[in-house]
Amino acid sequence: MKALVGQVQVELLLFLRNRTVISFSLLMPLLMVVFFGYLNRGGQAEGVSYSSFLIAGGIGMVVSSAAFENLGVALARQRDDGILKRLGGTPLRAWTLVGAKVLTAAVIILTQAILMIAINVLLFDAEITGSPLWGIVVLLVGIFAFTTMGFALAGLSRNTDAATAAASAISLPMQFLCGTFFPIEEMPTLLRHIARALPLTYFVDALRGAMLAGGGPWEYAKDWMILLGCLVIASVVAVKTFRWE
C-alpha cells in the first residue's frame, strides 16, 4: 500500500509539472463547457435545461481525454523512453504501477467533475435532480472501464506516434458525437449510428440518467452491460499486451 501511495504521488507530480497536458486535458474541457453553456444558456435538451444536460457530457469528455490522450499516450511514451524498462528493474510491481496510474486518473477526473458541476451550477443554474450516489457509482465504473481501454490502447500501439494517432482517432469523435454537447436524437442518421457504436455514448447516458433521473443499473441495463463488457474485454487485452519495453 505504501508503494502504491508513493507511486500515485509521483504520477500526480509528473502531471502537474506538464503544463501542456494541464492546458489541454484539464483546462480545455472546462473551457468547452463554459463555451457551450454560454452559447446555449436558457435552452433545453431532452426535457431538461441545457446546463443540466451538459454536466454529464462534460464529464464524459474528461473521462475520454484522461483515458486515451493522457494515460494511453503517456504510457506508450514512457515505454519508448525506457522509463518503464527502468521501473521494471526495480522492486515496483506491475499491479502497483497500473493501480497508481488508474488512481491518478481517478483523482484528476473527479477533480474536473467537481469543477464541471460547480461551473454549471454557479454560472448557468444547472440542477442535479437525480441521485448523486448513483452518479458517483457510474462515474467510478466509467473511470475503470475507460482507463483500462487506455492501457489496452498503449499495449496495442507499437510506439508513441501510433498511440497518439489512435488516441486522437478514438477520443475526438467520442467527445463530440456521444451525446456530450448535443442530444444524439438530433443528429443526422449516420452520426447517430456512429454514436451508438462508441462506448462513451453509454457512459454519458447512464451518468446523465443517474444525475438527472436517479436511474440505477436496472433502468439503464444496456448502458451498464456495455460498460462492464468493455471493462472485461479491455482488461484481457491490456493484460496480454502490457510490456515494460
What are the residue ranges of the model-derived segments?
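A short amphipathic helical element positioned immediately N-terminal to and/or at the very start
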Residues: 1-16, 207
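Membrane-interfacial helix-loop-helix junctions in multi-pass membrane proteins
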Residues: 42-47, 127-129, 175-233
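Alpha-helical transmembrane segments and their short interhelical loops
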Residues: 94-172, 218-228, 232-236
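Hydrophobic alpha-helical transmembrane segments of multi-pass membrane transport/permease proteins
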Residues: 14-42, 51-70, 111-112, 170-175, ...
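Membrane-interface capping segments at transmembrane-helix boundaries
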Residues: 239-245
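Short coil/turn motifs that cap or connect alpha-helices
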Residues: 93-94, 183
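Transmembrane helix boundary and interhelical loop/hinge segments in multi-pass membrane proteins
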Residues: 15, 67-92
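Transmembrane helix-loop junction
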Residues: 37-41, 61, 77, 86, ...
